[in-house]
């Protein structure tokens, strides 16, 4: 017996929504058609929603082990499926860092126990993410990591980054970088080095702290041949560097977060609400425009949430002391659909690709496809019903979002992972 998703629509090659039913059996899509034989199968009414491949997020912070007061693998995985994400890659800035086979195994086991989204851990580039000694890349790869990164901090040593890229290239592992030159940072800086920081008399985080590392690493990637991926790109100069790198034939990809696409520093309220504090910071209107242009022309390969939960107590410490980061798994698709697709900035087809097939292709994942024979990772979206973002309804432990109160369409109503229903609100 299988499951038929009926009364739904899928995007065709022209980007048009067309009626389609999908049969799921033994974790795979086994049939697709406008009308399927229901005999012997359970039938789920999708109420006219859009059926897509499950969303993929290449950048989340699940906080476990070590920071379970912020989030756990279970609560993060629940948040993922509630937001339509079926595969998430979790960053290594935990305690201990994900720098050993034992920690990788721990995370994979915890994710399996949770039985929600598929969680794939990153491995740290350097031991304890201190930038001094490379981890056991081969051992981490065999244990099942997604890629290698020291996200949370940038690899400051050019020599260390080159050595990491050389070794990763030999093993066929991607190097994923949080690009931030600490020599250009002023202690306590929390906002972009722009008009808002100046208005409040605060030190700012300059765009060049990001773009200098992007440029450095693209040159190293060209020399070593590694797949190099830039995290949460935020500055127009970084977009230009990635575009130039692609044109030169460098194997470089990058991601952008929803908040950098939808907000700029001038949107930050005068009370400096710390739910608007993230790293990279919200940058200028010009930077935001460059990010959207980068999505349109293919410079930016995917959208990733950079889901970063913190407690309310931590976020109450004021703009200078509160930790960087906001949550994003449960609001990403509705926000992007409402504010980019419905406004005409992106097509629906393009948005879905940026959240499914594009990250799958970049990181060579067998997911993100809506076709017979593909894994039955599926999401159904209600593109018509309006709902208000209410952090009290989040499955995540974190409620740190600047988007509370925003009214959106495009809410997930059903999520399947490997053919198993893990979220249902139909």
UniProtKB/Swiss-Prot annotation:
Transmembrane intervals: none
Task performed by this protein: Catalyzes the reversible cyclization of carbamoyl aspartate to dihydroorotate.
Catalyzed reactions: (S)-dihydroorotate + H2O = N-carbamoyl-L-aspartate + H(+)
EC category name: hydrolase
Cofactor(s) listed in the protein's UniProt record: Zn(2+)
Zinc among keywords: yes
GO biological process, one term: 'de novo' UMP biosynthetic process
Residues binding substrate, per UniProt: 61-63, 93, 279, 310, 324-325
Record's cofactor remark: Binds 2 Zn(2+) ions per subunit.
Keyword terms: Hydrolase, Metal-binding, Pyrimidine biosynthesis, Zinc
Name the UniProt record assigns to this protein: Dihydroorotase
Pathway(s) per entry: Pyrimidine metabolism; UMP biosynthesis via de novo pathway; (S)-dihydroorotate from bicarbonate: step 3/3
Lineage top rank: taxon: Bacteria
EC number, UniProt record: 3.5.2.3
Binding site for Zn(2+) 2: 151, 178, 232
Protein family per UniProt: Belongs to the metallo-dependent hydrolases superfamily. DHOase family. Class I DHOase subfamily.
Keyword check for 4Fe-4S: no
Gene Ontology cellular component terms for the protein in this record: cytoplasm
Residues engaged in binding Zn(2+) 1: 59, 61, 151, 306
């Amino acid at each position: 017996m299988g499951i038929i998703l009926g009364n739904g629509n899928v995007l065709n090659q022209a980007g048009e929504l067309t009626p389609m039913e999908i049969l799921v059996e033994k974790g795979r899509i086994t049939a697709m058609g406008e009308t399927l034989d229901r005999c012997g199968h359970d039938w789920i009414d999708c109420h006219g929603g859009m059926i897509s491949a499950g969303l993929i997020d290449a950048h989340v912070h699940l906080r476990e082990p070590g920071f379970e007061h912020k989030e756990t693998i279970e609560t993060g995985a629940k948040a993922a499926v509630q937001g339509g994400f079926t595969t998430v890659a979790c960053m290594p800035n935990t305690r201990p860092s994900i720098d050993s086979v034992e920690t990788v195994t721990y995370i994979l086991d915890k994710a399996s126990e949770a039985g929600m989204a598929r969680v794939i851990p990153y491995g740290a580039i350097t031991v304890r993410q201190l930038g001094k000694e490379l981890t056991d890349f081969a051992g981490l790869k065999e244990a099942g990591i997604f890629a290698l990164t020291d996200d949370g901090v940038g690899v400051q040593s050019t020599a260390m980054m080159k050595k990491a890229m050389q070794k990763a290239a030999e093993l066929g592992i991607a190097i994923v970088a949080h690009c931030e030159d600490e020599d250009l940072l002023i202690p306590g800086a929390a906002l972009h080095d722009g008009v808002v920081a100046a208005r409040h008399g605060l030190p700012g985080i300059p765009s060049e702290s990001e773009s200098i590392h992007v440029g450095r690493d693209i040159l190293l990637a060209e020399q070593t041949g590694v797949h190099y991926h830039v995290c949460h790109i935020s500055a127009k100069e970084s977009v230009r560097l990635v575009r130039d790198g692609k044109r030169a034939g460098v194997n470089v990809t990058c991601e952008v977060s929803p908040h950098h696409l939808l907000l700029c520093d001038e949107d930050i309220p005068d009370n400096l609400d710390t739910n608007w504090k993230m790293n990279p910071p919200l940058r200028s209107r010009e930077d935001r425009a460059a990010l959207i242009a980068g999505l349109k022309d293919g410079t930016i390969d995917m959208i990733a949430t950079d889901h970063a939960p913190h407690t309310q107590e931590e976020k109450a410490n004021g703009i200078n002391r509160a930790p960087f980061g906001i949550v994003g798994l449960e609001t990403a698709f509705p926000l992007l659909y409402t504010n980019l697709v419905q406004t005409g900035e992106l097509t629906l087809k393009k948005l879905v690709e940026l959240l499914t097939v594009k990250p799958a292709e970049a990181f060579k994942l067998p997911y993100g496809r809506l076709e017979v024979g593909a894994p039955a990772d599926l999401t159904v979206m209600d593109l018509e019903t309006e709902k208000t973002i209410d952090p009290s309804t989040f499955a995540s432990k974190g409620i740190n979002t600047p988007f509370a109160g925003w009214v959106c369409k495009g809410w997930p109503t059903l999520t399947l992972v490997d053919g198993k229903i893990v979220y249902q609100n139909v």
